[in-house]
């Protein structure tokens, strides 16, 4: 495990990247990591069985601090992050820095997170960076939530309390993973990051660190909504509507009411626009009822490897 000097203290921290058929984007991400003022972290690249030459790229780069793990099949973002977090946490890392392969951290992004960790004396569940679009505006897909129902209103000050965040630059301690377990791999895609961060924020204060900034160069930068998305992406929405049931039913009656209102509003939007209304309505409500009967297990770290 690589060790780096940050301030006057030694720390062991690993960075987990999940990738799937985005070789060029992964290369940009790794290049951005090499410019970190806090030093280059130990890298765990989890490849969801890419077919675009990602494995060959990693071999060519031959970075001494990089560990490459091919899952053998596409586990989705949820499965990939669960796998990578387990690998890194069990390796002995004290800190984990999690992000997608299309996330480009600014040079001091990690330094700002480590500084916040020191100021808080480790008394937090997770820290989240401010995510920007390539044009410099805030990335709408990655706005943190101040409550389960409300986006963060401001990035003022050194930190802002939050209860949900995406896996686009999330920073936490391995001890937190040991306490709360891993992301739910069965989610496959969507809401795995919100479920995981909310699971933690129920018990520990969590924060957005506005000075830690990353660019999320995602291909589809719109808010998740089947009413406005392209037809080729409709089938994957079954995971979104199913997984949100698991997330929001934990909030009690208010969570159920919010969930039903959200899905009903999406249904109204579908009826107002575009073709194949019945198909999209079916995806929404089949996903909802699948979620009612969906009770995935939260996996912890293997006891023998802690």
Regions found by a protein language model. Name each.
Residues 1-12:
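Single conserved hydrophobic/aromatic residue that forms the stacking wall/gate
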Residues 252-306:
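Non-catalytic, C-terminal membrane-associated alpha-helical segments of glycosyltransferases
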Residues 170, 176-181, 186-212:
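A short, conserved alpha-helix in the catalytic core of glycosyltransferases
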Residues 108-141:
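Conserved donor NDP-sugar-binding/catalytic core segment of glycosyltransferases
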Residues 93-102:
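Short beta-strand-to-loop acidic/aromatic patch adjacent to the donor-nucleotide binding site
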């Amino acid at each position: 495990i690589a060790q780096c000097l940050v301030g006057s203290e030694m720390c062991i921290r690993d960075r987990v990247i999940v990738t799937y058929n985005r070789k060029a984007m992964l290369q940009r991400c790794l290049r951005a990591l090499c410019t970190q003022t806090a030093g280059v972290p130990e890298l765990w690249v989890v490849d969801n069985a890419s077919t675009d030459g990602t494995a060959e790229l990693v071999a060519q780069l031959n970075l001494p601090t990089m560990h490459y793990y091919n899952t053998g099949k596409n586990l989705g973002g949820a499965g990939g992050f669960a796998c990578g977090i387990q690998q890194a946490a069990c390796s002995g890392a004290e800190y984990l820095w999690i992000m997608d392969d299309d996330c480009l951290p600014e040079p001091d992004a990690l330094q700002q997170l480590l500084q916040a960790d020191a100021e808080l004396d480790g008394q937090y569940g997770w820290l989240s960076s401010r995510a920007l679009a390539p044009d410099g505006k805030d990335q709408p897909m990655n706005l943190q939530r101040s409550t389960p129902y409300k986006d963060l209103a401001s990035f003022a000050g050194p930190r802002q309390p939050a209860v949900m965040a995406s896996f686009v630059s999330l920073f936490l301690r391995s001890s937190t993973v040991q306490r709360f377990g891993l992301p739910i791999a069965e989610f496959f895609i969507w809401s795995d990051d919100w479920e995981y961060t909310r699971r933690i924020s129920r018990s520990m204060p969590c924060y957005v660190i506005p000075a830690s900034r990353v660019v999320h160069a995602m291909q589809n930068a719109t808010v998740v909504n089947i009413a406005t998305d392209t037809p080729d992406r409709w089938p994957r929405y079954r995971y979104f509507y199913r997984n949100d049931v698991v997330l929001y039913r934990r909030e009690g009656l208010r969570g159920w009411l919010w969930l039903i209102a959200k899905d009903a509003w999406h249904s109204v939007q579908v009826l107002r626009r575009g073709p194949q209304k019945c198909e999209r309505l079916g995806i929404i409500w089949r996903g909802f009822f699948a979620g009612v009967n969906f009770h995935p297990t939260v996996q912890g770290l293997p006891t023998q490897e802690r």
